[in-house]
């Protein structure tokens, strides 16, 4: 099957351009099989603040205590995921909400105890994806469960998207709140591993963009076709990425 993994960042969900859902529907009509992964950071932040729960970050990852995990799962599974699924279904696009627990879509391996209940997805169940995408567009929340402890784990949505894309040998579109990787205040149309290494050394790629582009290269090395970072609030962003019409940053080896 010809898969395309589309990751929609939490900060992008409220500003997603109205044409994006239609673009995704068009992929299905072109015998392509989109898979949507979403985050929900701003919604989680708001819920934690409302409930008076401190939220700490370590190495760009949310330190996830039991209390933080409970709220995170409520927001991602109970609010963000069904809202996105409903938005698509309202446009007559057959979609189905999932997380790692459903149909044993994937297992979780804990990252490091300093992050609390933060894990990495493993054992992606491609048979489930193959079956579902024949009729539906999966919309996957970045929550999973440890096989042995049965405890829920928070997963970075980028990490989940990369893992699924490399498992399926698919391209990945990262729809973000930025137009791409900025170098000298301009979007860099194409980057490869050597470019990325040099720009990091020159501190032109910095902060949270460093792990994003490094993880992109790693995903490509393990099977992902390519990674494109683009702004989710751009009109027809998905179609423009697919047809190579000059949007965002394309990362290749």
From Swiss-Prot:
Catalytic activity, reaction form = N-acetyl-L-glutamate + ATP = N-acetyl-L-glutamyl 5-phosphate + ADP
Q: What InterPro entries does UniProt report for this protein, alphabetically?
A: AceGlu_kinase-like_sf, AcgluKinase_fam, ArgB, Asp/Glu/Uridylate_kinase
Give the location in the cell. Answer: Cytoplasm
Residues carrying the site annotation Transition state stabilizer:
7, 212
GO cellular component assignments: cytoplasm
Q: Which molecular function terms from Gene Ontology are attached?
A: acetylglutamate kinase activity; ATP binding
What broad class describes the main subcellular location of this protein? cytoplasm
- Disulphide bonds annotated for this chain are none
Q: Where does substrate bind?
A: 40-41, 62, 154
Which keywords, in A-to-Z order, does the entry hold? Answer: Amino-acid biosynthesis, Arginine biosynthesis, ATP-binding, Cytoplasm, Kinase, Nucleotide-binding, Transferase
Q: Classify the source by domain of life.
A: Bacteria
Q: Which family does it belong to?
A: Belongs to the acetylglutamate kinase family. ArgB subfamily.
PANTHER family xref list: N-ACETYLGLUTAMATE SYNTHASE, N-ACETYLGLUTAMATE SYNTHASE, MITOCHONDRIAL
Q: Which HAMAP family match?
A: ArgB
What job does the chain carry out? Catalyzes the ATP-dependent phosphorylation of N-acetyl-L-glutamate.
Q: What is this protein called?
A: Acetylglutamate kinase
Q: Which organism is it from?
A: Staphylococcus saprophyticus subsp. saprophyticus (strain ATCC 15305 / DSM 20229 / NCIMB 8711 / NCTC 7292 / S-41)
Q: Which gene encodes it?
A: argB
